[in-house]
Amino acid sequence: MTNKKQLQKLELIWIGKGEEPKLEPRILIENPEYSYGDPNCENMLIHGDNLLALKALEQDYAGKVKCIYIDPPYNTGNAFEHYDDNLEHSIWLNLIFQRIKILYSLMSKDGAFCIHLDDQEVHYAKVVCDEIFGRNNFISTIAIKSSTPSGVKTSHKDKKIIKQKDLLLVYKKSDELRINPQYVRKSEWDTHFNYFINSDNKTVSSFLEVLKKNRILTQKQSIRDFDINNEVHRDFYIKNADKICQTQSHKNIELKEASRKLKDEILHTENAMFYNGRQLTPLSNSLNNVVYRDKIEKDFALLLCDFWSDIDFQNTQNEGGVEFPNSKKPEFLIQRILALFTETGDLVLDSFLGSGTTAAIAHKMGRRYIGIELGDHAKTHCYPRLKAVVDGEQGGISKAVNWQGGGGFKFYTLAPSLLKQDKFGNWVISQEYNADMLAAAMAKQEGFKYQPHESSYWKQGQSSEQDFIFTTTQFLTIEALDSIKDEMQPGETLMICCKSFQKECKGKYANITIKKIPQMLLGRCEYGKEDYSLNIINLPVEREDEEAEDAIENTSVQAISDSKKKNDQPSLF
């Protein structure tokens, strides 16, 4: 149990907190068979455990991701039906906490983080995010209408409130974030717009009378019959947006008095119009880009706030050309999020890629992206969907953003663990590593950027302009060391990682450090672990006897995750 004297801040405590594993920083290996399109593109589709993949990205992408959107599995309770509630929530929180900590490190200072949840865990998740980001960096909880109260959902309406929403927690990393305001189309005509500026630009008429005169409405109809969704009506108000006006009060007393003196004539100033003591505001001031019938165009709009009720969740089955029942998010939802927080060329990341929606939208919007998916969906869903995007598919937001195809992506897998135990239990370098993979892995382990020099074989990676690393599986002799030293320039330093070396090499040169592998790696991190997702079948079943509470308290979350798994058992993350 946590010592009360050690608690120095308000925080959420759960079983397993503080037991986070030391993750091995893996290298990523491109699989050309599943890469597609422009070979020089920067877009990445990663197949592998998302916690290990995030760790693999940390060195090269820390502080570079502009927008992170994740849609982790909701802790619905279905997966944990037979298990102790305290353990259930602890496991979910432990998994999400580890991932968000790395995601935070990947965010740029002007970046945004969005996590999509329902109300089962959102309040716990907010406390976790408050701890990682700081409460002062919380932006909003956005409620998104995701369903309608009908069918089976309403069968228990006498026992519970029917769920109709999802929730989006939004955080920033610092005050450098700038939000691009977005707008939504009004659902009906605003009857305050009841004036129409005549062609003389001096007088006004009743908007209703103008509509009747132009046979938009009949003589018996009222302004409430003006239908914003009628194409004829819509064309009329868009065409005449500078003439259709509403009146508003104004603080400038002199202008109000001057306007009253004109009596039924418009007073024009440099920046405004006044009529009978009130300011005339044209409809054109309320036109903004909105999504309308799968297009983005100017229309009568309201500022988008924290309740989104206009996105269709019911007809996403055909988007992207892949099936993903009950879990696929609408393309227009992701488009809105990326429009709020990113610009063309910004880097977007989704570590729970699912069917590939976030990557597909980022691609169509001209953003760079990294998508991570653990399961077979990486090949069966994400790959074909992104391939279709490159080829110019026209579903989802394609017409709205005038997507014509192009670009590309590269498909990566995580390298196996660098060290494995032999039959005697000793840690040895995995035989799956060739010389290049080993050099790249050691560079990552030591914080160097793997970038082999064209002419100097021993300059395999560097951490600064004059600091280099060299990895070899050969026995390092004094002659080889002297040869390298002769090539080094003044001020250069070198780390050599090798399996063994001649004893005279040790300490011979002050600017050359020699380390033995694998000994130098032991104890640094957890080797041989390929999956940090949660197997939901093998959790300890809730016990009804009086020892249950003690059993739960002494259960390690890591031990649960490490329990024996079967290939056909689902994982939560």
Question: What are these model-derived regions, one by one?
Answer:
Residues 370-573:
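PRPP-dependent phosphoribosyltransferase catalytic core
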